[in-house]
């Protein structure tokens, strides 16, 4: 159903949809304090993720099967019901085997520290990260904090308890 009272707020090329029926309408701005590389930018106007850049004083070499924490120099203040997910960049993963170790990394709305990225080298050769390299993506998304209701039994479904391949591959 369409919400005809919905609005879109633009902040540094970030469009946030707000609706009177949604739970995340209290705030629509995302405040940031950025380092020398400025605020995160999207690769194209339709990109969902905002590129995070390495904020380094010297290059970092990631050996195969090694995980390192990379600074971004970025600090965020997120609205109450919006979180940010730190995701790998597909080209970095495909071409070099570099991924986000704890993907998706989660930035909670009450976190005020620097956004850092755990990069992992899944490749066979070392990889060098330089200052200003685009190392990951940041995806903003609303989330819901439900109330839990304890019950004796859950309702039955066709699937029921089947999991981990129970629906087959073909």
Question: What role is predicted for each listed range?
Answer:
Residues 1-170:
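DUTPase catalytic domain/fold
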């Amino acid at each position: 159903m369409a919400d005809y009272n919905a609005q879109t707020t633009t902040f540094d090329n970030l469009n946030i949809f707000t609706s009177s029926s949604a739970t995340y309408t209290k705030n629509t701005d995302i405040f940031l304090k950025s380092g020398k590389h400025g605020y995160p930018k999207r690769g194209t106007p339709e990109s969902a993720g905002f590129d995070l850049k390495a904020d380094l004083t010297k290059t970092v070499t990631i050996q195969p099967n090694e995980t390192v924490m990379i600074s971004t120099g970025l600090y965020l203040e997120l609205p109450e019901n919006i979180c940010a997910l730190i995701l790998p960049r597909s080209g970095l993963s495909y071409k070099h085997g570099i991924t986000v170790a704890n993907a998706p990394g989660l930035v909670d709305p009450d976190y005020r520290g620097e956004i850092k990225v755990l990069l992992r080298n899944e490749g066979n050769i070392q990889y060098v990260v330089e200052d200003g390299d685009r190392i990951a993506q940041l995806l903003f998304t609303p989330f819901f904090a439900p109330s839990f209701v304890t019950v004796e039994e859950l309702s039955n479904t066709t699937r029921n308890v089947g999991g981990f391949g129970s629906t087959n591959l073909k």
